[in-house]
């Protein structure tokens, strides 16, 4: 096994440039970090006995954010860090650049 798993060479077979690889991995790692925090915050707000209008608005906002996030896509990870997990998901082909956003960025 190489020093880094997955290797950059393996990853570049999935994404056509180092820049895109870094952008995709960092975005996915942020999502993986954000998901548990948002879930905890939502549960905390829902446990309030008398939620205020502000609490209700926050619940709606968090629920909307959670709808856009995808949870972990692999059953087992070798890495414990979000960036390593993101790279593993990219290598498995579970995370790809959104073609709609890709077209916009190339204009």
UniProtKB/Swiss-Prot annotation:
Cystine connections: none
SUPFAM superfamilies recorded: RPB6/omega subunit-like
InterPro entries: DNA-dir_RNA_pol_omega, Pol_omega/Rpo6/RPB6, RPB6/omega-like_sf
Record carries keyword Manganese: no
A GO term for molecular function: DNA binding
First-tier enzyme category under EC: transferase
A single GO cellular-component term on record: DNA-directed RNA polymerase complex
Catalytic activity: RNA(n) + a ribonucleoside 5'-triphosphate = RNA(n+1) + diphosphate
EC number of the protein: 2.7.7.6
Annotated GO biological process: DNA-templated transcription
Record's keyword terms, sorted: DNA-directed RNA polymerase, Nucleotidyltransferase, Transcription, Transferase
Assembly, per entry: The RNAP catalytic core consists of 2 alpha, 1 beta, 1 beta' and 1 omega subunit. When a sigma factor is associated with the core the holoenzyme is formed, which can initiate transcription.
Role played: Promotes RNA polymerase assembly. Latches the N- and C-terminal regions of the beta' subunit thereby facilitating its interaction with the beta and alpha subunits.
Similarity annotation: Belongs to the RNA polymerase subunit omega family.
Protein name: DNA-directed RNA polymerase subunit omega
Native species: Oenococcus oeni (strain ATCC BAA-331 / PSU-1)
